[in-house]
């Protein structure tokens, strides 16, 4: 039994806190199979400085723990559909969809992201230039 307990202790993982302008992300898992984050967006804040981002590989599901999450999903013309998620709501976002987040209430929005592995080379930031009528990738 003591050996089994020692083996379980080895499986305990550390987390990393990533401070952002809009809140923070607590990464509690990111390995070759999956990623887990607890994300907090402060009231009145929007992710990525208001820009959108997307992933070509990463498949994400969001689960709201506290507050209201406003998930904006962009279309090719620069418009977007806003999905409002309340506590205990979840939403799957498949690869390729441009998106951003904001808090929709006076309290911080906390939500869990469960996804395939997070890779920095699979995060693309962009915004829509209305004059050029095209997406600009930054």
Q: Predicted segment positions?
A:
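Short beta-strand His + acidic residue motifs that chelate non-heme Fe in jelly-roll/DSBH
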Residues: 49-55, 71-72, 93, 98-105, ...
């Amino acid at each position: 039994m003591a050996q089994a307990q020692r083996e379980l202790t080895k499986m305990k993982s550390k987390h990393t806190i990533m401070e952002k302008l809009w809140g923070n992300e607590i990464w509690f898992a990111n390995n070759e199979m999956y990623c887990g984050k607890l994300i907090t967006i402060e009231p009145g804040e929007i992710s990525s400085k208001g820009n959108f981002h997307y992933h070509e590989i990463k498949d994400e599901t969001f689960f709201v723990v506290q507050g209201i999450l406003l998930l904006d999903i962009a279309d090719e013309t620069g418009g977007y559909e806003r999905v409002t998620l309340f506590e205990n709501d979840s939403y799957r976002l498949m690869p390729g969809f441009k998106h951003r987040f904001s808090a929709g209430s006076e309290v911080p929005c906390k939500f869990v992201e469960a996804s395939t592995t997070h890779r920095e080379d699979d995060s693309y930031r962009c915004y829509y230039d209305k004059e050029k009528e095209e997406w600009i990738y930054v």
